[in-house]
Amino acid sequence: MRRAKGWVALSGTASAALLLITLVTLTSVRAASAPPDETRALWVLRSSLTSPASIDSLVASARTYGFNTLLAQVRGRGDAYYSSQLEPRAEDLQAQPASFDPLAHLLSTAHGAGLKVHAWVNINLVASASYLPVAPEHLVYAHPEWLMVPRALARDMATVEPASPAYLGRLARWTRSESGDIEGLYLSPLQPDAAAHLTAVVSDLVARYALDGVQLDYIRFPDERFDFSRYAVAAFRSDVAPGLPAEVRRELDAAAESDPLAYPNALPDEWSRFRRSQLSALVMRLRTAVRSRRPDAVVSAAVTPDVEDAYARRLQDWRTWLESGLIDAVCPMAYTPETPLFARQIASARGLAGTRAVWAGIGAFRLSPAQTVQHIQIARQQGADGFVLFSYDSMTGADRALDPYLAQVSRALFPPASGSK
């Protein structure tokens, strides 16, 4: 009993101390001021780009509530929410006349309202896990050999020609069965023709549209189990074999006769390095494509927030991208509702970014308006140059009609003049 009483007393003391710490922290957070030229952005899903009315509405909301930048998802799954000769028009636009160009309408309306527009481009992810595209010209049908293959299917897929319907069928079925972890079908940056296609898509975008920036998303591997496609493994073998001792090379060549994974299995560190370097090479190509067409456009990347996890599991070396100047801004997708973890992730990105910008990616879809405000203030406190809320669409449903989510965020954070420009 005495121990129980002591525990209660101690718990009360600890609770009081914790409350005091929390109040001090929150006071400090509230005091954080916005940096000069803060990027106040919204991620806009492609579902909000399907009509002139929906675009006009999102621009009006952004302007009213003090946001200054829209990251619009104009390439969702290897399709186009703009006029493209390289990829099929998005299925969601079937109800609109062929003359309707969502990106052109958005740029005209948003720039007229004083907002910046960045093309949010899903790079490697090109098809959903749950269904395949309708358009017969979609690249999953035109070039199934460009798709990443998981380790689990590597030996099986090595016996099937990519031109056979069975190739895509097996890959699609496996991906559907793993949809809890894998978003869909990915293009492989190890495929030179796939990398060239992606570069052409981005180059076409910035050449024909007055974009303020391009954000690279899904610029990663689904996880370390990919890409074990026949081309990728052969490319690795060609890259690494010349540097091996002759005896080791002979042994691996002999093993590869019966096991297509002989080289990756024997050289796992080199295999990861090779895949990582090829992804970084793609980032370099995309940056060059943007800057050669539109020198002032900002190149940003939405990244896995933990830099070590990104490096090891997603093969996404965004630390090097920053150090090498391949991106102008990094956007860690710090969607966690856990405030201490969010603070650590943004602080880490700020420490790694140097002179490059950090935009805190905030998972508003998982947070209350008050929590979103708190995370924005924490991002400011940690030295972020701006923030991006995911997503506009999740914050503007019918249940927000009485007191809109964005209105609550705006009242708490932005001076009145921000919403009246």
Predicted features, each with a name:
Residues 54-80, 208-213, 326-329:
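Catalytic domains of carbohydrate-active enzymes, especially glycoside hydrolases
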Residues 126-129, 134, 215, 224, ...:
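Substrate-binding cleft/loops of secretory-pathway carbohydrate-active enzymes
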Residues 32-54, 303, 365:
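Boundary/entry segment of secreted carbohydrate-active catalytic domains
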Residues 48-63, 194-205, 309-324, 342, ...:
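Short, acidic/polar
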Residues 67-100:
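Aromatic-lined carbohydrate-binding/catalytic grooves of carbohydrate-active enzymes
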Residues 326-344, 348-349, 356-421:
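Substrate-binding cleft of secreted/luminal carbohydrate-active enzymes
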Residues 116-122, 215-222, 264-314, 357-367:
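Aromatic-lined carbohydrate-recognition surfaces of secreted/lumenal glycan-active proteins
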Residues 37-39, 49, 119, 124-208:
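Active-site-adjacent "subsite" loops/lids of carbohydrate-active enzymes
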